[in-house]
């Protein structure tokens, strides 16, 4: 049996904005385009959702529902940086990661040895580390397949964890409305309802041949989902851009000397992760990342530099000089060169 975790950040864009500007918290706010420019809401916080504001809603309509709604423009680079930090945490546990967007992903932790292979404890630790490192919350679902893990992550949102064990699958699926099934959109849901099928229990009363006749090849999928079956694998990103290690410290590191003391253990873990890489990758530029106590951060990389302790120490010193403030997080890594890219260049010429 597989162990799949679906991780979904809670109101991701809005959470980043509220973290970086605490004056936005505890009031209805959204990230999106301006109403006068026919903008659309990208996401909103839970205070705004209480008024009926939703993603993909026209900003003008959102303001009618909630006249006090504050709409801020998106800062996509900040969201990408946060997403990369979260994926660095994911890679501590597994390389089998399928990103669905900046703020959600599937993880296959079937072969993971952390916490004696407990997917529940891994999900708990991911949630703890994301909060500790980024000060935003994520919800997680744990189940034997992707379909159920995604439903589970939404079950106790926000800031929740829900687990569906193999023994619980049958009972859980029976009560699900068909609108929760992966691939069932409005048209299919309406057709099912006209047939008197509203839940998976209803769907199970139909045999495979009936469903194939009524829905074509999708009927086979419907039958499987109604029985809690979903064999889709976690689709791993085809190419990695870098490998890195980050650590957030319980107490801020006060000066450069304290940061340098932490470097050897980080590089030891980086070496271990690089040894697990596919042979098609070779190391490129080293880089370091610092997040200061006020959540500002800087990243520095250097072409032609080596991958030894002294090389990273030099980069760390320059990065620290940019802020000269207590440090809450240190990251070290190396950009990767994919040999397939070079082979493609040779064929071109």
Regions found by a protein language model. Name each.
Residues 1-214, 219-220, 334, 338-349:
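Gly/Gly-Pro- and Ser/Thr-rich, intrinsically disordered tail segments characteristic of DNA damage-repair
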Residues 6, 180, 190-329, 339-343:
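DNA-contacting surface of Y-family translesion DNA polymerases
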